[in-house]
Amino acid sequence: MSPKISLTRYLVEQQRIDGHIPPELRLLIEVVARACKSISQAVNKGALGDVMGSAGSENVQGEIQKKLDIIANEVLIEANEWGGHLAAMASEEMDDIYVVPNRYPQGEYLLMFDPLDGSSNIDVNVSIGTIFSVLKKSEDDRGVEESDFLQAGNQQVAAGYCVYGPQTTLVLTVGDGVAMFTLDREQGSFVLTEENVTIPDDTQEFAINMSNMRHWDEPVKRYINECLEGKDGPRGKDFNMRWIASMVADVHRILCRGGVFLYPWDKREPEKAGKLRLMYEANPMSWLIEQAGGAATNGKQRILDIQPTKLHERVSVILGSKNEVERLTAYHSGL
């Protein structure tokens, strides 16, 4: 039997062999992973840990916060603020950036996260997760500002998520492919379970909230209608629909077996480019998908090339198997 490779060993070997992971970045990723283990424990306790239900507050997007949203946010901040790897953090659950306090050493990295994606699923025991993205701070000596975070997704140096489901699985990229690690609860560490994850170019599964179909743009309606027509329509094959209402869970399925995920613009809020957050959700997930051989777009532009203008910017998201994403891009171009 081959020996188990822990996350720490994997990162050290990547650092040693490929040079993709500087020591400070390796330590930062390990701290994020430890925070995810703590969040996993809180999620697993459920009603026994008094973590279910609403916290009675709203986040910056005006969404009702769950107790676990706040707990996960605090866990990530407390785990990362003192290590000396970070200059600042930004969270979907916080209005402004969180600068590392002066009592702790400051590092060269910026951490962004959605502490608990899919939190509407908490009370019904469906998979949820943590999404994170790491950027490098500019090298000047001035203090950290919000503008330091406003980098295109192609500037990320690490990205990943941790899905809390039947197993707790950490999925990571540092720009050299995608690796998956499963939490060994007896050992207390993440163990490498899959390397060089690859998404098939073609698929027969799509993930979208069909109840919103009447609000979509015509290119998305056209694509979904063709999928629904199945083998009798222009696609010549049947499709299945999947929708978990947790981006982490839907993207994890796509990384495991292919598919296409859509959260498109809709006309109910025409002034907003989309629903999902560019910096906390779309960028890290798009990089993971691309690193696995897939593609990600807002319909008109590669997501990783979008230059953000504000911290909580929203975006339309289409990602997954390459040929399906390219078809959708062509439809948006009028082809």
Curated annotation (Swiss-Prot):
Cofactor(s) demanded: Mg(2+)
Gene Ontology biological-process annotations: fructose 1,6-bisphosphate metabolic process; fructose 6-phosphate metabolic process; fructose metabolic process; gluconeogenesis; sucrose biosynthetic process
Principal location class: cytoplasm
Annotated metabolic or biological route of this protein: Carbohydrate biosynthesis; gluconeogenesis
The keyword Hydrolase appears for this protein: yes
EC number: 3.1.3.11
Annotated substrate binding sites: D117, G118, S119, S120, N209, K275
GO cellular component terms attached to this protein's record: cytosol
Leader sequence segment: none
Pfam families noted in UniProt: FBPase, FBPase_C
Positions bound to Mg(2+) 1: E92, D114, L116
Free-text comment on the cofactor: Binds 2 magnesium ions per subunit.
Subcellular location: Cytoplasm
Gene Ontology molecular functions: fructose 1,6-bisphosphate 1-phosphatase activity; magnesium ion binding
Top-level taxon: Bacteria
The entry's keywords: Carbohydrate metabolism, Cytoplasm, Hydrolase, Magnesium, Metal-binding
Binding positions for Mg(2+) 2 per the UniProt entry: D114, D117, E281
Reactions the enzyme catalyzes: beta-D-fructose 1,6-bisphosphate + H2O = beta-D-fructose 6-phosphate + phosphate
Family label: Belongs to the FBPase class 1 family.
Quaternary assembly: Homotetramer.
Name this protein carries in UniProt: Fructose-1,6-bisphosphatase class 1 1
Species: Polaromonas naphthalenivorans (strain CJ2)
Gene (name only): fbp1
